[in-house]
Amino acid sequence: MKIHKGDMVIVISGPDKGAKGKVIEAYPKRDKVLVEGVNRVKKHVANSATERGAESGGIVTQEAPIHVSNVAIVDSEGNPTRVGYRFDENGKKVRIARSNGKDI
């Protein structure tokens, strides 16, 4: 999966189209990412359970994972771009933005 934790992404389809956020968590086996402030859902939490952002029980609003095909990584200029790879001088694989060729 080409999008990792900590990347800035923009939602390119769905109800939150156009929203930008930071990737909180990546789930490569499920091809999903958790983006800050995007795909917020209400979850009913028991009094004893402690979920993300829940201090006590009740109805909690939190982010839900979104499929990786619905987000695009943001390049250094703030535009959505695809991700490519190249090898640097040490032979290490580096992610690059396809739009401008700069490292991500």
UniProtKB/Swiss-Prot annotation:
GO terms for biological process: translation. One of two assembly initiator proteins, it binds directly to the 5'-end of the 23S rRNA, where it nucleates assembly of the 50S subunit. One of the proteins that surrounds the polypeptide exit tunnel on the outside of the subunit. It comes from Corynebacterium aurimucosum (strain ATCC 700975 / DSM 44827 / CIP 107346 / CN-1). One of its GO terms (molecular function) is rRNA binding. Pfam families: KOW (PF00467), ribosomal_L24 (PF17136). This is Large ribosomal subunit protein uL24. The gene is rplX. The keyword Ribonucleoprotein applies. SMART domains: KOW.
